[in-house]
């Protein structure tokens, strides 16, 4: 029988510690709520310029630097294309590749062309062999139950671009070996990996930049798979977005398109903003990824130079002992690295540029970091 006396010992101490911890967490949450410290419906502090001005690509003035979204899925939350275009214009987005999930054969992949001055590419996403295949610039129906190699074949048959997404979930690299590109980062996948409760608490307690920064983690496995594939063939690197999440946090909403469009973008370097040259840039890897909440990126260059000849991202050149690789950033990064085979071969700290002589043939790409998070990831230069 319980004597009415206060218990002591390890169990009582554990209960007391748990109670104190619970009270501390409750007080912390209450302070965050009262102070409005969480991100709520706040936007990341992406320092967009006053208006969108498309600029020439650094070192390649015949091309323009267009920023956009690959893998946008508006139907999941009922956002129509006109509203999506309005959100894109506010975020200074130049193009969007639509990718709603395809569950049955359809020719409704969204409206192609310009909507409110934003260029849309119709397309869809197909679940396949554990991962996903994104089809860009689609018109004709495709059977979604096909295996990944057949899906890629059907996308190519109608002139579309095939991107492998969630590559770490495929059972084999051979499933997506014929794809034009790989999405090495997926905002939706990063969200899912964090877990809804962790997302909720972060949104409650952290400001928007720290909250979204927690999702911006170097995608180690995807980069490993990408580097392995790029050793044997040229393949484009992009970032995927996915569907908006719209998580309710005390009357606010987190994970909206309005927020996501300010986090990361895929840049295409093309002579004009028309479907054909833009798709060509995507196929050829004339592209790079930027996480703009760490600093708006209007221009970036990674290229090889040998005398007067320059080779841009996505292109191939013959190796020469006089050849060097150059990185040019729009502003200073905490760290810049030139990477080959997943390992850095040259580094610079607190700089906006890096140059290095090349010692051997290989597949080289550039990475720039701020605050320990990826800021800019380039497509490779292939030196054979």
Model-found features: residue ranges?
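Bacterial N-terminal signal peptides
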Residues: 25-34
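A metal-dependent hydrolase metal-coordination microenvironment
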Residues: 43-202, 206-207, 212, 216-224, ...
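C-terminal functional module detector
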Residues: 41-65, 69, 77-81, 231-237, ...
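C-terminal motif of bacterial Sec signal peptides marking the signal peptidase cleavage site
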Residues: 37-38
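Cationic, low-complexity basic patches in intrinsically disordered or flexible, solvent-exposed regions
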Residues: 16, 21
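Hydrophobic alpha-helical membrane context
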Residues: 32-33, 83, 112, 254
């Amino acid at each position: 029988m319980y004597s009415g006396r206060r218990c002591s010992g390890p169990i009582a101490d554990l209960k007391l510690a748990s109670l104190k911890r619970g009270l501390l967490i409750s007080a912390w949450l209450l302070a965050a709520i009262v102070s409005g410290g969480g991100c709520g419906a706040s936007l990341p502090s992406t320092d967009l310029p006053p208006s969108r001005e498309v600029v020439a690509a650094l070192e390649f003035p015949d091309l323009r630097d267009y920023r956009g979204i690959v893998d946008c899925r508006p139907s999941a939350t009922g956002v129509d294309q006109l509203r999506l275009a309005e959100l894109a214009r506010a975020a200074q987005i130049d193009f969007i590749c639509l990718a709603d999930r395809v569950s049955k054969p359809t020719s409704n992949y969204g409206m192609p062309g310009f909507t409110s001055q934003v260029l849309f590419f119709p397309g869809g996403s197909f679940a396949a062999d554990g991962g996903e295949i994104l089809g860009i610039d689609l018109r004709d129906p495709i059977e979604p139950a096909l295996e990944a190699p057949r899906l890629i074949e059907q996308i190519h048959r109608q002139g579309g671009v095939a991107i492998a997404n969630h590559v770490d979930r495929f059972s084999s690299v051979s499933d997506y070996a014929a794809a034009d590109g790989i999405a090495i980062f997926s905002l939706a996948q990063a969200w899912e990996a964090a877990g809804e409760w962790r997302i909720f608490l972060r949104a409650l307690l952290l400001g928007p930049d720290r909250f979204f920064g927690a999702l911006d983690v170097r995608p180690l496995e995807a980069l490993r798979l990408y580097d392995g594939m790029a050793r044997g063939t040229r393949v484009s690197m992009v970032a995927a977005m996915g569907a908006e999440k719209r998580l309710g946090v005390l009357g606010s909403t987190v994970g909206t398109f309005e927020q996501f469009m300010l986090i990361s973008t895929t840049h295409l370097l093309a002579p004009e903003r028309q479907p054909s040259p833009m798709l060509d840039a995507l196929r050829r890897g004339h592209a790079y990824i930027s996480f703009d909440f760490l600093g708006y990126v209007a221009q970036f260059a990674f290229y090889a130079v040998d005398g007067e000849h320059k080779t841009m991202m996505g292109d191939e050149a013959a190796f020469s002992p006089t050849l060097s690789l150059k990185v040019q950033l729009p502003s200073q990064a905490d760290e810049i690295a030139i990477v080959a085979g997943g390992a850095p071969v040259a580094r610079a700290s607190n700089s906006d540029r890096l140059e290095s002589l090349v010692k051997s043939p290989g597949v080289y790409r550039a990475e720039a970091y701020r605050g320990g998070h990826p800021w800019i990831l380039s497509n490779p230069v292939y030196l054979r």
